[in-house]
């Protein structure tokens, strides 16, 4: 039982250290094309094979404006409509705020776009975000992380994914064998 406890402690330490190391994919690109609108917050990331996106844009908005969030890849196009409920107006002015969490996407997603338009105008791209990959080390999404690491030629993500998956299998086998051996002698 002591080796299993030591392995569990090492696994927790490894998971915490792996998440604290900055990844080369942690690049956030912000393009501001107008003096009337300003992107104040722009974050996006992958977690458990799903896209999470958070941001805020302020400026000269009216209730006729709306923001659309688009997911762009070579083989996948999707537009998420941020509803009017995210439109706010207070003493600081008008702003849009969005927090999209848990939108399932394939491993081929390259970028997330924010477009702003009025009900009758053409949408214009105001910001873009390259999603960072945040590991979750669950067996549900092992295939997604393997495909993403091979697609991006990210060998660090590939080896980290394989190492953690194999480590979790070893711990599972040790726990199973330890419990069955203990039950046999009771």
Curated annotation (Swiss-Prot):
Disulfide bonds join 44-129. Glycans are attached at residue 60. Residues 21-160 are lumenal. One of its GO terms (cellular component) is host cell endoplasmic reticulum membrane. One of its GO terms (molecular function) is D-mannose binding. It comes from the Viruses. Its main location: host cell. Keywords: Disulfide bond, Early protein, Glycoprotein, Host endoplasmic reticulum, Host membrane, Host-virus interaction, Immunoglobulin domain, Lectin, Mannose-binding, Membrane, Signal, Transmembrane, Transmembrane helix, Viral immunoevasion. The keyword Disulfide bond applies. Residues 1-20 form the signal peptide. The chain crosses the membrane at residues 161-181. Residues 182-186 are cytoplasmic. Belongs to the cytomegalovirus US2 family. Retains, but does not degrade MHC class I heterodimers in the endoplasmic reticulum during the immediate-early period of virus infection, thereby impairing their transport and maturation. Forms a complex with beta-2-microglobulin-associated class I heavy chains, which accumulate in the ER. In consequence, infected cells are masked for immune recognition by cytotoxic T-lymphocytes. This is Membrane glycoprotein US3. It comes from Human cytomegalovirus (strain Towne) (HHV-5). The gene is US3.
